[in-house]
Amino acid sequence: MTKERLLAALDKPRTTRGLLTVVNPGGSEDQVQTMLMQMREEGLVKFDINKGLWSRA
């Protein structure tokens, strides 16, 4: 799983679980969450706390 694949999967806002099923079915949700947090710190993605959705920044 790469940052590029995660960004490509964010063609629309998705939940962490939704991203996992698109990018790496059967993978670790913790791994996706960790990568998303790193990408958020870099300003690549944002999280809507009210809706629970990740999207491109």
Task: Give the ranges of each region predicted by the language model.
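Short, leucine-enriched amphipathic alpha-helices that occur as contiguous helical runs
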Residues: T2-L7, E29
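Short amphipathic alpha-helical interaction segments
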Residues: G26-Q38
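Short capping segments at the starts of secondary-structure elements
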Residues: A9-G18, G27
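Short, cationic-aromatic polyanion-contact patches
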Residues: F47-A57
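Glycine-centered, phosphate/nucleic-acid-interacting loop/turn motifs that mediate DNA/RNA or nucleotide
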Residues: G43
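Residues within the alpha-helical elements of helix-turn-helix
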Residues: V22-N24
